[in-house]
Each structure stands twice: as structure tokens, then as C-alpha cells.
């Protein structure tokens, strides 16, 4: 996956897809009651980026639905995954359940259209800290209560706070979640980051029978050299401010026969087995 980072304004969606992204990440900002209002990051944010771009979340979901609905004039076949960077760390953990209900409901109403020609992209729920795990419970409860559990097939989970991998596994066990799990590792592009935890995550992913990591991505990469480093380690995805650089690196001789950009025919929840 070549994931565009911080794609918060509606006009940025096509901008990032034009640069070669096949997935986009956007920030979901909540009010104090856990109601998801805007796609907005705010200050401070990644180096060299404007932090203040935003959209009303429901309008954003309406737009990306069109972009991911075959037959729609706005349809772009390359967009296969939407990563929701849920800014739960800005609200109290007690509101994580309410937030999960709200996000699930908004996806049902504005993205999936409750089964009436909704968008087809996979959804990755990026949760900053394990303490906010109630969000996942609420999200799944809501799909069940609303009679739309079929969308679980499209939804994955990812804890993004670089916490201890075994702690993350314990929380997933507690939730009864052992599939559709991504593991991100990274830091804002302003700072360098070593590969120790990334390697551990990849090791777990590649352990036969280990269910709690099926895919790993590194974020937020801007330098081609760091993209190469991550690809050599065998990541499943890269989140970048410059998706066109990722495309370029993937075309290099060293990588072109090992990697390709994922398409909708690929399953984002299955462990990748090299040929």
C-alpha cells in the first residue's frame, strides 16, 4: 500500500491519488462528547505540511464514497483503502465507546449507505492508544445492532501509538479480535526513527500461527532512502507525504520484481506469502 498521509481536505483526495497513492489516511477529530465532527489534524503536524486543512466528516465520507463506487463519475479504481486516524487521545477514554458508536453510524449512513450502493474501499481504524480499545467494541456492537455485520469483512484494526506489541496483543485478545489486524510503526516525518520495533512487528507477522498482526506499515516516510530501508525489511505498506516518491522507488530494479502496488483484487487482511 502506498498510503497518502493527512489527506484531510476533499480536494486533496484526488491530488494524492494523482500522485500514485492507492490508500489515503485522514484525521477524525471529535468533540468532547465523542462526536466525530471534522477531518482535521491541527497544529503541530508533519514537517512541510499545512496542518489546518479540514472538511466536515460526513461531507468527506460522502465524497470518498463516490470515489470508491464503481459507475460513479468520480470513481477512481486505484483507491482501495481508507485509514481513519481517530484522534481519540484528545478526548477522555470514557468517551471512546460513544466515539465508536458515532463513527460506525456515520460510515453506515454516509459511506456504506446501509447497503444501497455504498463505497467499496476497505476501512482501517487507526487507534492511537490501547486504552481506547472500547472504541472497537462500540464500533462492532453498532454494526451488529444496526443489522450490518457484513461490513466487518471490510474493517481492520491498527494501534498506532508505538506501544508494546505484547500489550497490544493482550488487548486484542480481550476484545476477541484475531483477524484483520495491521500494525503501524513510525513517527512524524520531522524526526528520524530506528527500525527495532518495526523489525519486531515484522517478525511477529511472519511467525507461523501468529494471528495478531497480518500486515505492517511504516510511517511517515518522506526520504526515498528510508522508503528503501522499509521495503528491504519487507513492510506491507508505507505512509508518505509524497506517494509519487514511493511509486518511483517501487519501480527501481531492486524492488520491481518483489513489490507492486496493491489493487482492489488483493486482500488487505491476508498475510502476504512471497512467491
Swiss-Prot record:
Protein name, UniProt field: Dermonecrotic toxin SpeSicTox-betaIIA2iii
Q: Which cysteines are joined by disulfide bonds?
A: 45-51, 47-190
Give the matching InterPro entries.
PLC-like_Pdiesterase_TIM-brl
Q: Which GO terms describe its biological process?
A: killing of cells of another organism; lipid catabolic process
Q: What tissues is it present in?
A: Expressed by the venom gland.
Q: What class of enzyme is it?
A: lyase
EC assignment: the record states: 4.6.1.-
For this protein's source organism, the top of the classification is: Eukaryota, Metazoa, Ecdysozoa, Arthropoda, Chelicerata
What subcellular locations does the record give? Secreted
Role summary: Dermonecrotic toxins cleave the phosphodiester linkage between the phosphate and headgroup of certain phospholipids (sphingolipid and lysolipid substrates), forming an alcohol (often choline) and a cyclic phosphate. This toxin acts on sphingomyelin (SM). It may also act on ceramide phosphoethanolamine (CPE), lysophosphatidylcholine (LPC) and lysophosphatidylethanolamine (LPE), but not on lysophosphatidylserine (LPS), and lysophosphatidylglycerol (LPG). It acts by transphosphatidylation, releasing exclusively cyclic phosphate products as second products.
Query: Does the record's keyword annotation contain Lyase?
Result: yes
| Catalyzed reaction equations | an N-(acyl)-sphingosylphosphocholine = an N-(acyl)-sphingosyl-1,3-cyclic phosphate + choline; an N-(acyl)-sphingosylphosphoethanolamine = an N-(acyl)-sphingosyl-1,3-cyclic phosphate + ethanolamine; a 1-acyl-sn-glycero-3-phosphocholine = a 1-acyl-sn-glycero-2,3-cyclic phosphate + choline; a 1-acyl-sn-glycero-3-phosphoethanolamine = a 1-acyl-sn-glycero-2,3-cyclic phosphate + ethanolamine
Amino acid at each position: 500500500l502506498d498510503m497518502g498521509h493527512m489527506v484531510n481536505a476533499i480536494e486533496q483526495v484526488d491530488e494524492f491519488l494523482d500522485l500514485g497513492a492507492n490508500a489515503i489516511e485522514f484525521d477524525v477529530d471529535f468533540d468532547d462528547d465523542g462526536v466525530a465532527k471534522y477531518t482535521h489534524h491541527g497544529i503541530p503536524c508533519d514537517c512541510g505540511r499545512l496542518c489546518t486543512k479540514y472538511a466536515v466528516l460526513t461531507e468527506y465520507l460522502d465524497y470518498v464514497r463516490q470515489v470508491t463506487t464503481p459507475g460513479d463519475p468520480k470513481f477512481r479504481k486505484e483507491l482501495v483503502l481508507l485509514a481513519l486516524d481517530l484522534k481519540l487521545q484528545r478526548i477522555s477514554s470514557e468517551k471512546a465507546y460513544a466515539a465508536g458508536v458515532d463513527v460506525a453510524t456515520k460510515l453506515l449512513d454516509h459511506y456504506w449507505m446501509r447497503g444501497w450502493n455504498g463505497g467499496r474501499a476497505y476501512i482501517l481504524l487507526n487507534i492511537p492508544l490501547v486504552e481506547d480499545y472500547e472504541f472497537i467494541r462500540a464500533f462492532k456492537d453498532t454494526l451488529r445492532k444496526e443489522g450490518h455485520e457484513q461490513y466487518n469483512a471490510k474493517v481492520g484494526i491498527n494501534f498506532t501509538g508505538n506501544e508494546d506489541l505484547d500489550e497490544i496483543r493482550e488487548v486484542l485478545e480481550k476484545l476477541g479480535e484475531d483477524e484483520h489486524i495491521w500494525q503501524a510503526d513510525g513517527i512524524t516525518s520531522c524526526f528520524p526513527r530506528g527500525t527495532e520495533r518495526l523489525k519486531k512487528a515484522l517478525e511477529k507477522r511472519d511467525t507461523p500461527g501468529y494471528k495478531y498482526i497480518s500486515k505492517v506499515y511504516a510511517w511517515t516516510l518522506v526520504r526515498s532512502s528510508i522508503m528503501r530501508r522499509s521495503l528491504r525489511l519487507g513492510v506491507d505498506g508505507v505512509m508518505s507525504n509524497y506517494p509519487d516518491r514511493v511509486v518511483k522507488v517501487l519501480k527501481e530494479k531492486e524492488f520491481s520484481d518483489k513489490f507492486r502496488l496493491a489493487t482492489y483484487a488483493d486482500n488487505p487482511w491476508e498475510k502476504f506469502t512471497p512467491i
